Amino acid sequence: FLVDKIIIMGRPDEEETLLRVDAAINKKYRHADGTEMTISRVCWDTGGIDGEIVYQRSKKHGVFRVLPVKGASVYGKPVITMPKTRNQRGVYLCEVGTDTAKEILYARMKADPTPADEATSYAIRFPDDPEIFS
């Protein structure tokens, strides 16, 4: 289920922007049954910004909670490759097989819809709210 969509505008090298990112990572959600849910894992793309910023936030939030990732456009590469050891910066820099991930996601999005209360393996569920796509 897609639970939320958060867009954080600002410069990634400014602490004020990073504090808003921290708030999004630490946000709590309430399930319909009252159970509190937190975000247990975040992948943060290092492309396009100084990777050191992402590495520092990974260390701040926990190296297994915030995973720095970089794309690898190699057909057939696994969706994500978790290294066995930390890199020189002390974090686990994961590679994302972007072509493979897109192929899997697009295939799952083509699946016939099922009722929301019906358990469906590997289903992607979006809210019934057109604003989520804007």
What are these regions (language model features)?
Residues 2-133:
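Mg2+-dependent endonuclease catalytic cores in nucleic-acid-processing enzymes, primarily RNase H-like
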